[in-house]
Design a protein with these regions (language model features):
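C-terminal substrate-binding/catalytic lobe of Rossmann-fold NAD(P)-dependent dehydrogenases
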Residues: 1-186
Length: 186
C-alpha cells in the first residue's frame, strides 16, 4: 500500500503518465483472498517487438537509444524465469539489509531519477526520429508527434505537451535536453 501511495502521488505531478498510473493501481490491487495480487503474478515479461525495432533502428542510424535498448534487455532477462530461479539457488546474493536513511529523501531521489530517465528516453526517441527523417527526407512535425502520443498510448505522459512546446519554440531542436525546460529538469 505504501508503494502504491507513492506512485499515486507521483502521478499527480510531473510524472503523470499511463505507466505511473497503472503501477499505482497494480500495487494496491488485492486478490480475492485479500492478499496483494502482485505477489502472485509471474515475473516474466513478454514483448511485442516495438522496443526491439526501436533499439535496432538506433544502431542502424547511429543514434543512442540506450534506455530503450536496456528496457528490451530487461524484458529478455525477465523472460528467463527458469534460469533465474535456478541461478538464485546456486549464486549467493547479498544479505537482506534494512534501510536506515531518510526515507522521504530516498523516495524523492528515486522520483527525480525516474523523471530524468523518462526525459532522456524521450530525447533519445526524438533523436532517432530526427535521424530517420534526415536519412529519408521526411519533414516531420515533432510537436505534433508528441501530442499524438497523449491519447490512449502506453507512453502518454503529461510532459508530452512540454515536448510540443520545445519543438514549437525551436523546430530545428536537435535534442530535447538542449531545450530550456528539459535542461532545467535534468
Amino acid at each position: 500500500d505504501e508503494m502504491s501511495k507513492v506512485f499515486a502521488e507521483w502521478n499527480k505531478g510531473e510524472l503523470d503518465s499511463f505507466l505511473i498510473e497503472i503501477t499505482a493501481n497494480i500495487l494496491k490491487f488485492k486478490d480475492s483472498d485479500g492478499s496483494p495480487l502482485l505477489e502472485k503474478i509471474r515475473d516474466a515479461a513478454g514483448q511485442k517487438g516495438t522496443g526491439k525495432w526501436t533499439a535496432i533502428s538506433g544502431l542502424d542510424y547511429g543514434t543512442p537509444t540506450t534506455l530503450i535498448a536496456e528496457s528490451v534487455f530487461a524484458r529478455c532477462l525477465s523472460s528467463l524465469k527458469d534460469e533465474r530461479v535456478k541461478a538464485s539457488s546456486v549464486l549467493v546474493g547479498p544479505e537482506g539489509a534494512t534501510f536506515d536513511g531518510d526515507k522521504k529523501e530516498f523516495i524523492e531521489n528515486i522520483r527525480k531519477a525516474l523523471y530524468a530517465s523518462k526525459i532522456v528516453s524521450y530525447a533519445q526517441g526524438f533523436m532517432l526520429l530526427r535521424e530517420a527523417a534526415a536519412k529519408f527526407g521526411w519533414n516531420l512535425n515533432y510537436g505534433g508527434i508528441a501530442l499524438m502520443w497523449r491519447g490512449g498510448c502506453i507512453i502518454r505522459s503529461v510532459f508530452l505537451g512540454k515536448i510540443k512546446e520545445a519543438f514549437d519554440k525551436n523546430p530545428q531542436l536537435t535534442n530535447l535536453l538542449l531545450d530550456d525546460f528539459f535542461k532545467q529538469a535534468v
